[in-house]
Amino acid sequence: MKPTTIALLQKYKQEKKRFATITAYDYSFAKLFADEGLSVMLVGDSLGMTIQGHDSTLPVTVEDIAYHTRAVRRGAPNCLLLSDLPFMAYATPEQAFANAATMMRAGANMVKIEGGAWLVDTVKMLTERAVPVCAHLGLTPQSVNIFGGYKVQGRGDAGDQLLSDALALEGAGAQLLVLECVPVELAKRVTEALSIPVIGIGAGNVTDGQILVMHDAFGITGGHIPKFAKNFLSTAGDIRAAVRQYISEVASGVYPGEEHSFH
């Protein structure tokens, strides 16, 4: 299998070919995902909750992400691998660059950072220094204390601000955008306005791609299950079949359905 590139995702967007992505944290699952056709993976700071058992992503460190990035890269050598910069790892552009370098050395192809137009200088600095950036707007879990919990973002006038932020981040050099927990109508506006691929999670089926936390995709999340999650393992029978079903339902637009979407 040839390495998956950002240019390929750009081609998918132009061809309106929806693609599926997933979080991965270890060698074994990364290899399984790659074998079944998932060629874009994220080492997310969600590991703070799914792997480490915290109640938020805030305790996750740069070294935590780097450790899991190395493991995932060994399992999926040809995937396009995104790694989160965790909470307080990019408070300044200089800090962001130092920590992004750690991720790239660990095997990441690009780093993901959460936040709006205040990150323009950081995105510009990283891009100019050959570090590809995936921006993340909408519900940004590192800001949970400001949002007052995990709530849908971008309703009303806030939608205009989010679109403005998305355009500013693209202008600064961001090459991908993750859009989390926003109304379908806003997700459509953003996806159509941007020339870069938009990956949704809780943003309806109008984005260029979808991402799920692997634990949500297989129904092994304890406690609250997000509205946008679907347990593909419940009908597929085994994990490999569940991965193939996820890829297929994203490609056809079946997932996410209306029951997984916000308005």
UniProtKB/Swiss-Prot annotation:
GO terms for cellular component: cytoplasm. Keywords: Cytoplasm, Magnesium, Metal-binding, Pantothenate biosynthesis, Transferase. GO terms for biological process: pantothenate biosynthetic process. It is found in: Cytoplasm. The keyword Cell membrane does not apply. Mg(2+) binds at D45, D84, E114. Binds 1 Mg(2+) ion per subunit. Disulfide bonds: none annotated. It comes from the Bacteria. It is an enzyme of class 2 (transferase). Pathway: Cofactor biosynthesis; (R)-pantothenate biosynthesis; (R)-pantoate from 3-methyl-2-oxobutanoate: step 1/2. Its EC number is 2.1.2.11. Its cofactor is Mg(2+). 3-methyl-2-oxobutanoate binds at D45, S46, D84, K112. It catalyses: 3-methyl-2-oxobutanoate + (6R)-5,10-methylene-5,6,7,8-tetrahydrofolate + H2O = 2-dehydropantoate + (6S)-5,6,7,8-tetrahydrofolate. InterPro entries: Pantoate_hydroxy_MeTrfase, Pyrv/PenolPyrv_kinase-like_dom, Pyrv_kinase-like_dom_sf. PANTHER family: 3-METHYL-2-OXOBUTANOATE HYDROXYMETHYLTRANSFERASE. Homodecamer; pentamer of dimers. HAMAP family: PanB (MF_00156). This is 3-methyl-2-oxobutanoate hydroxymethyltransferase.
